[in-house]
A protein has these predicted regions:
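Bacterial N-terminal signal peptides that target proteins for export
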Residues: 1-12
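Bacterial N-terminal signal peptides
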Residues: 11-21
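Signal peptide processing junction and immediate N-terminal pro/mature segment
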Residues: 22-28
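Aromatic (tryptophan-biased) beta-strands that constitute blades/sheets of beta-rich domains
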Residues: 28-123, 128-144, 148-149, 166-178, ...
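Repeat-blade elements of multi-bladed beta-propeller folds
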Residues: 67, 116-154, 158, 179-208, ...
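Terminal-region recognition feature
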Residues: 76, 157-160
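Short loop/turn segments that connect beta-strands within beta-propeller blades
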Residues: 163-167, 212-216, 259-263, 307-311, ...
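C-terminal structural cap/anchor segments
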Residues: 418-430, 436-437, 441
């Protein structure tokens, strides 16, 4: 994993953006664009003693020993990629871990176990000093605790800790109390804080929590926010840490800026917003960060850039429909850009998934590809069309491309799509056996050939040659891969609906 990460860092245009511009940005005067005037908002400061300014805007996840948040970094660009010795030919199962099963009936159905959308596992390679500390302090370790650990939230309402090598429990599970749909986030400052968001209220209290791995205890719980502009208190977004702050988004339509230590978490400030003339909507996608700016999309299609220091909107873009896929930030020749696309939800049975590339600093549209999609009938329900998968940037022999899964694009199933990042044009699309919400991950050979693994909702895993879209191998590997995988070495770890977390080898 380290070898390919070094290649990506060297080959990326990110090398052009040295520390000085980031520092200048952090100290720049507050600025907003006319598009931000479309947003009605309030900012509430809860802690006036702690300065709101950022002292460092580097991406803390770039040097984290593993994959600590959804899509790896605060840019959500998934630079953590697998390594292959040669062109791969197949996928095989290494181990399967069984979760509990939650049979409670909720107002939103029964959720069972395993993992759902987005449900990406985290991965950590513990430094020796923290291995020793945890062996001394933690009451939750098992005999299988080791240096390489997988952490995943389950629809059963539990958080599981798994030894990467053996697939056995590395710690006692943590009972969160309600189904967890989204992706957890581990603090890259290595203070042991694990940020957990509950997704479905099977019981009360319902909300978000912080669990500390060193003490193996819950240190904070945040329940329903009575002042929120939306009365749905789920926390599917994966929090992100910037400097000394934790940024947590909620489906209640609020951005929370927190300060967190090993023993306590406090709200520093918060921002509530809505499009003028509209009701408030929530966020299921995870926030991205570049410099001192926070980026995200919501359930009606608002794409916002917010100043992290002030929590005031900088710019707004209307993408016209529910946008559940997480935005991706990319540093390219000519600037910093944001990629996003929408679902087909509010439009009716058919419409467009609007895949857009925006100037991340101004919100100006670079290009838009209106991809015709439709809702899909499955299990007597209409499933939304469009994009739920978070896009993957191409590197190596696929530099200049971006990949994603689309639902209902020209068929009742799903499509794996490659798009040219310069023009927005579809380079190719390959039909999958069914629709896919899972986000693709990349693996590279020594000569920088890119291969992709992605899953669909009937349990297929696809091994794809990224340059051509050729599907090399398909494995029926689970019940339903809504969850996104994490890639480690030449393997992936991914959960499925039901009761399973799997490790697969790409060979």
């Amino acid at each position: 994993m380290r070898e390919i990460n070094n290649f990506l860092m060297l080959s990326s245009v990110a090398a052009m953006f040295v520390a000085a511009p980031f520092a200048a940005m952090a100290q720049s005067e507050e600025k907003s664009f006319p598009s931000a005037e479309k947003i009605e908002y309030v900012v509430e400061v809860k802690d006036s003693e702690t300065p709101a300014q950022l002292t460092n805007v580097k991406d803390l996840y770039d040097n984290a020993p593993g994959v600590f948040t959804f899509r790896g970094t605060s840019r959500r660009d998934m630079p953590q990629s697998g390594t292959l010795k040669a062109r791969p030919s197949g996928i095989k199962r290494v181990w399967t871990f069984q979760t509990a099963f939650d049979g409670r009936q909720t107002s939103h159905g029964t959720w069972g176990g395993g993992s759902g959308w987005t449900g990406q596992p985290l991965y950590v390679e513990w430094p020796d000093s923290l291995m020793e500390r945890q062996r001394k302090e933690s009451t939750g370790l098992t005999a299988n605790f080791s240096k390489r650990e997988v952490i995943v939230g389950s629809l059963s309402g539990d958080v599981y800790f798994i030894d990467y090598e053996s697939g056995r429990a590395s710690r006692k599970s943590h009972k969160s109390g309600n189904p967890i749909k989204g992706t957890l986030s581990l603090d890259p400052r290595l203070n042991g804080n694990l940020y957990i968001g509950q997704g479905i209220p099977a019981s009360q209290p319902f909300g978000a929590e912080v669990f500390n791995l060193f003490s193996h205890k819950r240190t904070s719980f945040f329940g329903m926010d009575a002042q929120a502009w939306r009365r749905w208190g789920a926390y599917d977004p994966s929090p992100v840490v910037v400097d000394n702050f934790v940024l947590r988004l909620s489906e209640n339509g609020t951005i929370y800026k927190l300060t967190a230590s090993e023993k306590s978490v406090k709200t520093h400030s918060l921002m509530r917003f809505r499009h003028r003339g509209s009701k408030a909507y929530g966020m299921e996608s995870s926030p991205a960060v570049w410099g001192k700016y926070l980026y995200f999309s919501d359930n009606i299609g608002n794409i916002l850039c917010v100043d992290i220091e002030t929590l005031k909107p900088v710019w707004h873009y209307d993408n016209r429909d529910d946008s559940d896929a997480t935005v991706v930030i990319a540093e390219e020749e000519g600037g910093v850009y944001l990629y996003s696309s929408s679902a087909v939800d509010k439009q009716g049975d058919s419409g467009y998934s609007r895949f857009v590339k925006l100037n991340a600093l101004t919100g100006e549209l670079v290009w838009e590809n209106k991809i015709a999609c439709k809702k899909i009938q499955y299990c007597e329900k209409a499933r939304e069309g469009g994009m739920f998968s978070t896009p993957l940037l191409g590197h190596g022999d696929c530099e200049g491309l971006i990949f994603t899964n689309m639902c209902g694009m020209g068929s009742d199933k799903g499509s794996f799509v490659a798009i040219d990042r310069a023009s927005g044009k579809v380079v190719y699309k390959k039909h999958l056996q069914f629709y896919a919400w899972s986000s693709p991950v990349a693996l590279y050979t020594p000569d920088k050939q890119m291969f992709v693994v992605t899953g669909d909702v009937i349990g297929n895993l696809y091994l794809i040659e990224a340059k051509t879209g050729n599907i090399i191998y398909t494995l029926k590997g689970g019940n339903n891969f809504e969850s996104s995988p994490v890639v480690i070495d030449n393997c992936i770890v991914v959960g499925s609906r039901g009761r399973e977390i799997h490790k697969f080898e790409i060979y």
